[in-house]
């Protein structure tokens, strides 16, 4: 009998590919929120009339009184009309929330208890817009579409990672993103002592201090309380701040510690390091409140009183030991055992107590220094984390300024969204080598003898900048970014076919470093010029940036800069040797 010949499958059409992409993205969104403990209501394709318009919600996720009305899109073009429509729809839902609830109960009678658990005035409803691709919104766009909270790709990938690692315990991260406090979630609390955490102080003599304005106090705290009140300043999260220095949590490390806890049932003896919130209090054995300066006697049996507020205790070291106690949401043997240990095990915690007048940036510097000291001889810290710590400790260090310039370039202009500024980013351009081997020399405030940098040409207040004035630092970063946009704007104009070609070498690290080094070296000849000057320079230069013909390999940055200086800037060879 002849074998039947299998018919070759034809490749999926563009429409089929788009359909699969949409389904995959929706599945990821659903898994992320349900993985964090939210309940999914399948509102997709359910049209309803709310207020004065017809609305359709892609997905609804509920935890207690927190409702997340989610809109997603895989569109790359024409996205502004979609955002406007969804912004108006969320506004209509908020204005007519009782009608929205009634309609949902009608559509989903099996979920009526969940949908009617809270009065409408207690429900906190958020309109989340989750795009697969960054829509590149301006500040004006964010203001105009104020009914929506945008979960951009980096933020979504961050939440997806955290939920995958610590399951339901990642919910507090989402609440922090939404700027929610504990008293806004669930039923209204009475505000009694049940909302306080009492922790016995172990070493009151230890608060001799790191600086005059920082004290240190050690105490015992249950894993559950710590898990429910802590947060971590991870550099890959959604916050637009330079004061973030912690690395991403590691799933393998969490798993290893969790298995140890399940097997041994013991806490780790090395202490957790945290920064405590400002509203802590101290109480002696007679329950009288005392100041921190009065608790220097071990015999007084003092207690530390903390408000039971999520995201209030900043973890400096020990995030894996804390989060290994996560709530999985799965009724497994391991979860039942860990649930017992969360309440039973008390971890040794050393907390920094800052004077209330210590600014956020100074607190971050102290915290990052401690993190650096602790981890310098432990697990190898990624270079991006070390750069971030250096940036916090010394914001005017050349690499610190260079990193700030990279982030500024990534926010607007020709490089917007192209830079990989986070380990979760899908940006086309990796930046660590650009900062380290090229950009730092262009922006340094202390160029080597005989060398030049943009600092020389900047007309801002140099003395203030050198004294680490934050406003002047931002002004200098803005200046450097604008110069680079003009320079590379001319490059893009004259080499557009290579700029738009993902396979070309124009936007490779080798090429970009060569261009930046060339710009730095030519300062001694031309100084700082404008777009028209650079446009003229590159209009008369022709170079093949195709991946097949590009002749330079890794680390040949200076050699490529010679090509640019000699053949684009027309700088003689004998001059090249001196700059």
Language-model segments: residues:
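Accessory terminal alpha-helical modules
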Residues: 3-6, 10, 47, 51-57, ...
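Short Pro/Gly-enriched beta-strand edge/turn motifs at strand-loop
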Residues: 35-45
């Amino acid at each position: 009998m002849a074998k039947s010949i299998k018919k070759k499958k034809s490749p999926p059409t563009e429409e089929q590919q788009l359909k699969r992409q949409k389904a995959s993205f929706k599945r990821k969104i659903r898994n992320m929120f349900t993985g964090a403990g939210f309940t999914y209501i399948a509102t997709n394709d359910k049209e309803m009339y709310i207020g004065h318009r017809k609305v359709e919600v892609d997905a609804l996720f509920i935890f207690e009184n927190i409702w997340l009305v989610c809109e997603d899109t895989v569109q790359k073009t024409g996205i502004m009309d979609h955002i406007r429509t969804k912004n108006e729809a969320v506004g209509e839902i908020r204005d007519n929330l009782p009608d929205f609830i009634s309609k949902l109960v009608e559509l989903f009678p099996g979920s009526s208890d969940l949908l009617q658990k809270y009065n409408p005035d207690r429900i906190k409803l958020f309109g989340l817009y989750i795009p697969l691709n960054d829509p590149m919104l301006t500040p004006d766009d964010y203001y105009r579409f104020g009914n929506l909270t945008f979960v951009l790709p980096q933020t979504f990938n961050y939440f997806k990672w955290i939920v995958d690692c610590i399951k339901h315990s990642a919910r507090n991260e989402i609440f922090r993103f939404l700027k929610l406090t504990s008293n806004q979630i669930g039923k209204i609390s009475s505000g009694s002592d049940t909302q306080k955490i009492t922790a016995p102080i172990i070493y009151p003599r230890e608060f001799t201090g790191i600086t005059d304005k920082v004290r240190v106090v050690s105490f015992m705290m249950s894993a559950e309380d710590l898990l429910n009140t802590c947060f971590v300043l991870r550099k890959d999260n959604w916050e637009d701040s330079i004061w973030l220095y912690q690395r991403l949590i590691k799933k393998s490390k969490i798993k290893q510690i969790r298995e140890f806890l399940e097997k041994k049932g013991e806490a780790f003896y090395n202490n957790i390091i945290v920064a405590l919130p400002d509203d802590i209090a101290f109480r002696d054995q007679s329950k009288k409140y005392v100041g921190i300066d009065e608790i220097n006697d071990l015999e007084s049996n003092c207690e530390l009183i903390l408000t039971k507020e999520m995201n209030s205790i900043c973890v400096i070291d020990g995030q894996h030991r804390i989060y290994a106690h996560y709530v999985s949401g799965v009724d497994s043997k391991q979860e039942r055992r860990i649930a017992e240990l969360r309440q039973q095990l008390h971890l040794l915690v050393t907390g920094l107590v800052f004077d209330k007048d210590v600014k956020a940036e100074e607190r971050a510097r102290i915290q990052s220094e401690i993190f650096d000291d602790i981890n310098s001889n432990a697990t190898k810290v990624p270079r991006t984390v070390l750069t971030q710590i250096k940036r916090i400790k010394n914001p005017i260090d050349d690499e610190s300024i260079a990193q700030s310039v990279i982030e500024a370039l990534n926010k607007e202009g020709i490089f917007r969204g192209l830079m990989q500024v986070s380990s979760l980013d899908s940006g086309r351009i990796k930046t660590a080598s650009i900062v380290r081997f090229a950009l730092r020399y262009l922006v340094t405030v202390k160029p080597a003898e005989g060398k030049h940098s943009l600092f020389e040409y900047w007309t801002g207040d140099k003395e203030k900048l050198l004294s680490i004035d934050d406003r002047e630092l931002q002004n200098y970063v803005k200046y450097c970014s604008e110069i680079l946009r003009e320079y590379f704007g001319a490059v893009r104009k004259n080499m557009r076919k290579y700029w738009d070609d993902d396979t070309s070498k124009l936007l490779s690290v080798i090429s970009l470093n060569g261009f930046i080094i060339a710009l730095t070296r030519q300062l001694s000849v031309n100084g700082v010029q404008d777009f028209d000057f650079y446009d003229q320079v590159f209009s008369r230069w022709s170079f093949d940036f195709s991946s097949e013909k590009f002749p330079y390999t890794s680390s040949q940055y200076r050699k490529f800069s010679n090509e640019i200086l000699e053949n684009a800037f027309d700088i003689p060879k004998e001059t090249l040797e001196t700059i």
